[in-house]
């Protein structure tokens, strides 16, 4: 004789008050992030949530980047997640970076390429790594800096994407010196021109200040 199914009435089912909103936020996060492995991403999501860590969640849904050769790889949204998770540290180790990179299902080969380009040792300067990662998104120095502004800004989406001049100067100087083909006087001239604009903008720089300048890169 088959076992009868246990029947419950509504009064017997106790739904934790926080559960509906938690599941709603999880669903919205999954839709925005579009993880390739939903099960693994869900494990990473709830693990971070239980530890009070930054969640591996994109701020908005990203359309595929047309210039990418494949449908995998770093995107501005994923880089922003990494930055939110690691920006509190001036330096990180590969052992700290690798799990977070893998949690976003990014190719390890791309991470190794960025680390090799920066010639990083065991301790990785996070903002230098961030600058190179922006280069991986855009290719040119100007494109990399534009991505950096859009990721680092506290302006709302669609705003001018301003960042402090001192932060911009550090990113640009690092990339320009790493490039090795931009004369020092050209670097100084570009920064001097941009500093004047920043002073009239409360010490802030935005992409429209430099995307029209040809002195940003050779």
From Swiss-Prot:
It is found in: Cell projection, Cilium, Flagellum; Cell projection, Cilium. GO terms for cellular component: motile cilium; radial spoke. CDD domains: DD_ROP. Residues 17-54 form the RIIa domain. It comes from the Eukaryota. Keywords: Cell projection, Cilium, Flagellum. InterPro entries: ROP_DD. Residues 199-218 are annotated as: Disordered. One of its GO terms (biological process) is spermatid development. Its main location: other. The keyword Zinc does not apply. PANTHER family: ROPPORIN-1-LIKE PROTEIN. Component of axonemal radial spoke complexes. Belongs to the ropporin family. This is Ropporin-1-like protein.
